[in-house]
């Protein structure tokens, strides 16, 4: 039996369900999910292995017009990834027509030799007439090998999407062991899980002015518990107060919720300590971005 393997990137506007889709396929919480846009900052590499194929997924930041150095970094990662892969999944969600954000990405995809599959997500929220109308509009662009409707959250039609992807995989080796589902360091995943909870507990302009650095991650000697220290960086003193909350209640909520997810990830009890520090304009500081892993 021949074995197929290859690399697939997932692109799309912020907040269309790219990370939800990848997490549904992999079956583990690897990519950060939030109801706020631009939540994925690093090119997360996840691995899905079956007996006769292996797919390596690259979950890129949403392609958008950048407003700062961090935004430039995110878009650079997303567009460069298109050159490295065997197939591209372009994820869009419900709407009445192709919006300017999706049209911007379509323009970026013109002339790309890599096979592109359009994934219409959130079909559970669309009626048949709207779905058919969108299908026709995207088909007229002429750049998609296939168009498929799914619900990433519910898992509807995701199996058929996988079958489509496998068609474009070349024969190749297992790039990663069967048990491996990501190449990301645990410290980075822990930081992203904490940042997800910050996005959940805060609002307005605060979330995307926030970064998390895991400074300590160590198993206690002779005990089934991992000590984790992490620093939350924000850009304004007022943001620090909002993240901490009255009497520290909001920070405690962030910590408790993050700890529960981290314990599931690591399969161990976790003692999590969080600090909040102000680092003004960190998104435009190349040194700070490099320190936080955005290089």
Curated annotation (Swiss-Prot):
Pfam families reported in the protein's UniProt record: KH_2 (PF07650), MMR_HSR1 (PF01926)
This protein's record includes keyword RNA-binding: yes
Function according to Swiss-Prot or TrEMBL: An essential GTPase that binds both GDP and GTP, with rapid nucleotide exchange. Plays a role in 16S rRNA processing and 30S ribosomal subunit biogenesis and possibly also in cell cycle regulation and energy metabolism.
Domain of life (superkingdom): Bacteria
Species: Alkaliphilus oremlandii (strain OhILAs) (Clostridium oremlandii (strain OhILAs))
GO molecular function terms noted in the UniProt entry: GTP binding; GTPase activity; ribosomal small subunit binding; small ribosomal subunit rRNA binding
Major location (coarse): cytoplasm
KH type-2 domain: residues covered: 194-280
Era-type G domain segment(s): 4-171
G4: annotated span: 121-124
Assembly: Monomer.
Topological relation to the membrane, as annotated: Peripheral membrane protein
Cellular component, GO, one term: plasma membrane
One biological process term in Gene Ontology: ribosomal small subunit assembly
Similarity comment: family membership: Belongs to the TRAFAC class TrmE-Era-EngA-EngB-Septin-like GTPase superfamily. Era GTPase family.
List of residues binding GTP: 12-19, 59-63, 121-124
Region (G5) location: 150-152
Name of protein: GTPase Era
Entry's localization field: Cytoplasm; Cell membrane
Keywords from the named record: Cell membrane, Cytoplasm, GTP-binding, Membrane, Nucleotide-binding, Ribosome biogenesis, RNA-binding, rRNA-binding
Region annotation (G2) ranges: 38-42
Keyword presence, GTP-binding: yes
Region (G3): 59-62
Region (G1): 12-19
């Amino acid at each position: 039996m021949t074995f197929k393997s290859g690399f697939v990137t997932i692109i799309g506007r912020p907040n269309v369900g790219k990370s939800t889709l990848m997490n549904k396929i992999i079956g583990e919480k690897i990519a950060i999910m939030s109801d706020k846009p631009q939540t994925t900052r690093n090119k997360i590499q996840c691995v899905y292995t079956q007996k006769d194929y292996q797919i390596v997924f690259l979950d890129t930041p949403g392609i958008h017009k950048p407003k700062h150095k961090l935004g430039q970094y995110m878009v650079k990662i997303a567009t460069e990834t298109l050159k490295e892969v065997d197939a591209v999944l372009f994820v869009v969600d419900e709407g009445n027509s192709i919006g300017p954000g999706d049209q911007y990405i379509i323009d970026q995809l013109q002339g790309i030799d890599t096979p592109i599959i359009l994934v219409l997500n959130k079909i559970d929220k669309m009626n048949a007439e709207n779905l058919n109308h969108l299908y026709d509009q995207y088909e007229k662009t002429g750049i998609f090998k296939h168009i498929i409707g799914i619900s990433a959250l519910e898992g509807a039609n995701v199996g058929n999407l996988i079958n489509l992807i496998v068609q474009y995989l070349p024969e190749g080796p297992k790039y990663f062991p069967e048990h491996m589902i990501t190449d990301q360091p645990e410290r980075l995943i822990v930081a992203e899980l904490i940042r997800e909870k910050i996005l959940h507990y805060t609002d307005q302009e605060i979330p995307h002015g926030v970064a998390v650095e895991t400074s300590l991650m160590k198993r206690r000697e002779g005990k089934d518990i991992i000590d984790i220290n992490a620093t939350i960086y924000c850009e304004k003193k007022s943001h620090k107060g909002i993240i901490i909350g009255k009497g520290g209640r909001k920070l405690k909520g962030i910590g408790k919720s993050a700890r529960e997810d981290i314990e599931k990830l690591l399969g161990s009890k976790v003692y999590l300590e969080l600090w909040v520090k102000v680092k003004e304009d960190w998104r435009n500081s190349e040194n700070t971005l490099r320190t936080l892993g955005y290089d």
